[in-house]
Amino acid sequence: MISIDLLDNSGTSMPADTSIKLHEVIKFISKSKKMTVLTGAGISCNAGIPDFRSSDGLYNMVKAKHPKAVVRGQDLFDISLFRDEMSLSVFCTFMESLYKSSLNAKPTETHKFIKILKDKNKLLRCYTQNIDCIEQHINLKLGINLQEFDNNKFKQVWNQLDVVQLHGNLHKLSCTNCFSQFNWNEEFQTLLANGLNPECSKCMDKYQQRLYSGKRLTGQTIGLLRPDIVLYGEHHPQMEILTQGLNSDLKSRPDCLIIMGTSLKVAGVKSLVKSLSKIIHNKGGKVIYVNKTKLSASSWKNYIDYEVVSDCDEFVRMLKTEIPDLFLTQEQLDSEKLNQVAVKGSSLNKPIVKPEAKVKIEPGIKQEDAIQYSPEREVTIKQEVNIKQEPIVKREVESVSVKEEPIPTPPTTPHKPKQATKLKRKSPDEISANEVHSRVKRLRPRNDQLSSPASSINGSEEEEEEDEPVAKVLFENARKGITLDQH
C-alpha cells in the first residue's frame, strides 16, 4: 500500500516522490472505465450536516432536549435502545434533527464527482454507509423498493440503482411490526421531534377490523414507526437483495474501487471491500483510499494499493485541475472544440501587418530632408554615412530569338519492309539421291515436249540414250550446288 499524505504538504511545494505517486493515481482514475465507489460520513461533513461530537454537533443538541438522559453516541445506533423508553425518546429526537439537517444539505464536490462518473458511463455502482440521501439532490437514483424487486426482473431493477444504501434510508419510516414503509409528513415529524414514535396505520386498521368482527386479538400488536435504517445488532431486512445485487456487480468485473470518507470499521463493509479488491486485482485494476485518517497498513496492505491522506473534496478539486475534461459535459467539450477551431481559423485568415519602421535622424541631416525619406530607406541612410556604396552595374540582357518549332507528335511504330527470302544454296553433300531422282522425273515431261513427234514414235532407245546425259548433267550440277531453276 503506497501512502500519499497531502495534508502535510498543504500550502507547500509537493515533493517529487509524492507528485509522481499522485500522478499515477490521477492517471488511473482517468483511464478507468468501470468504477465502483464506497462512501462514508466523511463526504457529508462539507454538506452542511452537523457532525456528532463537536460543540454544535447533534449529540449536544439532543442532550439539550433530554438533560436527564445518559446515552452515549454509539448507543443511538444500537438496537438495545428500544429496551428503554428514555433511550428510545432520545433516539427519536436525534433522528428528527438529522432528517431536518439532511433536507437543507447541499451536495459536496465528492457527491458531484459521483454524478459525473455516472454521466460519463464510468460508474458501475456507488455503495454508501450514509443515510442522509444527499445523492437524490443531484438526480442519482437510490433506495431499495421491495415491491419493485418482487414484480420485475431482479437484474433489470438492480441496474437502475446508482447508489446502494448499505445502512438504510433516513427519508423513509418503517414499521417495527409489519415492516411497511412510509414517507415523512408534518405529523410524523412533530411526534418524533418530541421524542414520540408514531403508530403504524396499517397495523391499526388490521387491529380494528379484527376487533369489530369479534375475532381474537391475541398476538395482535400495533407497530411503531422509526427511520428505515439498520442499527448495530439488527438483522438487515434487505440482506437477500443486497447479497444478490453485490454478487451481480462482482460478475461485472469492475476495474477500480475508490473508498472515500470512511474508516472501514464496520464488519460488513470490510467484507465488501475485500471481495471487490480481489476481483479488481485479478483484472489488473487498483483500489484507492481517500480519507483524513490513515488505515492500519498491516491490515489493508494486501487489499488497498494507494492511500491518499486528504479531505475528500480537496482531492476532487485536485482532480478537476489535473483532468478537467473528466468534469465537462459532452456539450461543453463540443463547444470547446468549436471555439478552438474558430480561433485557429481566424488566426489563419488574419492579414499579417508589418510594423512601420521609424525614421531615425542622423547627425548632419535636416529634419525636412529626413521626412522625404521613406521607411524602406532607413537602413540605406546609415550606410551612406559610413560605408561607400558600390556603383550599380546595369547588365543588359541579350535578346534571344526563339524559333517556333512544330509541336512534336508522338512517334509511331516504324514500318519495317519485308525482306525477300534468300534461297540458300545447298552443298553437294546435303543433296540426297532421292532428290536427284525426283528432279529427273520432273524433267522428263519437259524433255518430251521439246523432242519431235517423230522421235517419240520411232522408239524408246533414243529417249533412253538422251535421258542418260541429262541425268549426268543434273548429278554434276547437284554436286556443284547448282539447281535447275537457276538455269
From Swiss-Prot:
GO molecular function, one term: histone deacetylase activity, NAD-dependent
Source domain of life: Eukaryota
Needed cofactors: Zn(2+)
Biased composition annotated in UniProt, kind: Basic and acidic residues: 397-406
Keywords: Cytoplasm, Metal-binding, NAD, Nucleus, Repressor, Transcription, Transcription regulation, Transferase, Zinc
Skewed-composition ranges (Polar residues): 448-459
Enzyme class label: transferase
Sequence segments annotated as region (Disordered): 397-487
Residues engaged in binding NAD(+): 40-59, 129-132, 261-263, 291-293, 312
Annotated compartments: Cytoplasm; Nucleus
Name of protein: NAD-dependent histone deacetylase HST3
EC number: 2.3.1.286
Binding residues for Zn(2+): C175, C178, C200, C203
